[in-house]
């Protein structure tokens, strides 16, 4: 078990982290997600031991790494670190990068390096290559192998996939998650990419202004965000004002079931795109009627602007487009799920 307990950090008069508490179980994967300047990288640096908190405690396996009386240096923490773009030593070969820090004979070190290359699916023929001679994805695997060589109990990943192209980023992320799980190494990923966080982690911590706004499973923070800002940060969301009563919200898109039967009065609600079904209207349609005013077609997802004959308001939303809808097309709007009701 790794724990942060009431950890705070200031730089000058700026409160960068404020009373952060987080628990990680062995072999688990946690993503810390938030906008630039929210404190993500500073938090990783405190965990790694590159910086020290002003207050609070950091423990691993019940032993203090930082407390008012203890401060374990970074090289003694058994924590691996993979920074952005790998940060390989340019003057060392792939083999030398991975073997850096392994205290063993030359023969034993080479044996361990080969085993690590196999573990991260790197061709052994790359061992004598220089970092600039291999691809970005291969460089990240070298950085991961180098970190794993220290047999860490915890792995820190500071936006390590951000420099990769979209397809390579997804495959490298999946391979990294699988590898860490197989090795039983707990991992903390820092990212500003919500999709990356949701797909990588078993626990999401949303950080904002140096505080955790919400911590929970990816499913919980996505479908039950604590507030509007968290909802919009984690993905496309339709935020509406509604009159809530008896388990339903009356709003611009009609009467929508809500996730809190106790909620009453004027409230703000959230709908994700998934339960919104938009189809060309047919004769005798009983669903809510609207007209496409504008469409920004982007393949799988499109941005639609809808107008309603009996309402002055318009509605703009991102949604799956089953077929190309042209401006002027009458459509039917159906809600197949529940809306999230935010606290009053």
Q: Where are each of the predicted segments found?
A:
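ABC ATPase nucleotide-binding domains
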Residues: 78-80, 93-229
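Helix-to-loop junction immediately C-terminal to a conserved catalytic motif
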Residues: 48
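The feature captures the beta-strand-to-loop junction immediately N-terminal to the Walker
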Residues: 33-35
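Glycine/charge-rich catalytic "coupling/switch" loops of P-loop NTPases
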Residues: 250-295, 322-344
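Conserved ABC transporter NBD signature motif
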Residues: 56-67
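Conserved coupling/switch loops of ABC nucleotide-binding domains, chiefly the family-specific signature
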Residues: 54-57, 209
């Amino acid at each position: 078990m790794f724990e942060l307990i009431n950890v705070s950090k200031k730089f000058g008069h700026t409160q960068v982290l404020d009373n952060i508490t987080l628990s990680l179980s062995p072999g688990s994967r946690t993503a810390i997600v938030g906008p630039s300047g929210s404190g993500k990288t500073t938090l990783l640096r405190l965990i790694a031991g590159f910086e020290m908190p002003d207050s609070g405690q950091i423990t691993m396996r019940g032993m203090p790494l930082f407390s008012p009386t203890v401060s374990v240096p970074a090289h003694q923490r058994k924590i691996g670190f993979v920074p952005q773009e790998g940060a390989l030593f340019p003057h060392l070969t792939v083999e030398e990068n991975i073997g850096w820090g392994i205290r063993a004979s030359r023969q034993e070190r080479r044996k361990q390096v080969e085993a690590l290359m196999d573990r991260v699916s790197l061709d052994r023929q790359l061992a004598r290559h220089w970092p600039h001679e291999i691809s970005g994805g291969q460089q990240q695997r070298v950085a991961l192998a180098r970190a794993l060589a220290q047999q860490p109990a915890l792995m820190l990943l500071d936006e390590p996939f951000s420099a990769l192209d979209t397809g390579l980023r997804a495959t490298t992320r999946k391979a990294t998650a699988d590898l860490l799980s197989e090795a039983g190494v707990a991992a903390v990923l820092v990212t500003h990419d919500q999709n990356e966080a949701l797909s990588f982690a078993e626990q999401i911590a949303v950080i904002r202004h140096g505080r955790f706004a919400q911590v929970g499973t990816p499913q919980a923070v996505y479908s039950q965000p604590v507030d509007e800002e968290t909802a919009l940060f984690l993905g496309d969301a339709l935020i509406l004002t509604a009159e809530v009563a008896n388990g339903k919200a009356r709003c611009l898109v009609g009467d929508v079931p809500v996730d809190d039967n106790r909620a009453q009065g004027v409230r703000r609600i959230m709908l994700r795109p998934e339960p919104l079904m938009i189809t060309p209207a047919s004769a005798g349609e009983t669903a809510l009627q609207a007209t496409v005013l504008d469409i920004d077609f982007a393949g799988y997802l499109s941005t639609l602007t809808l107008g309603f004959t009996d309402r002055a308001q318009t509605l703009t939303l991102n949604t799956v487009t089953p077929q190309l809808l042209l401006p002027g097309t009458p459509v039917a709007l159906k809600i197949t799920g529940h809306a999230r009701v935010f606290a009053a």
